[in-house]
Swiss-Prot record:
Lineage, uppermost ranks: Bacteria, Pseudomonadati, Pseudomonadota, Gammaproteobacteria, Chromatiales
GO molecular function, one term: electron transfer activity
Keywords linked to the UniProt accession: Electron transport, Heme, Iron, Metal-binding, Transport
Quaternary assembly: Monomer.
Organism for this UniProt entry: Halothiobacillus neapolitanus
Pfam families (alphabetical): Cytochrom_C
UniProt name for this protein: Cytochrome c-554(547)
Amino acid sequence: AGDAAAGKTLYDASCASCHGMQAQGQGMFPKLAGLTSERIKTTLVAFKSGDTATLKKEGLGGPMSAIMAPNAAGLSEQDMDNLSAYIATLK
């Protein structure tokens, strides 16, 4: 299971500039608040591995994938668990 406090630190440093401080989305960057931790983790894993089939199934994988993929590439399994735990607390 992920550590939401550690996830918040990582989110604030790496995700908030595009997705917003409360994950409400900004412009072309999607809202993450309200998603389950499972969906967030699945999506992060897909971005990291380049799994375009899963991204398309999730309604993702458009032009913004070029921005998201390198961000996900550096995440460890624990980072993804922590981010998923934190983002799932946001409504």
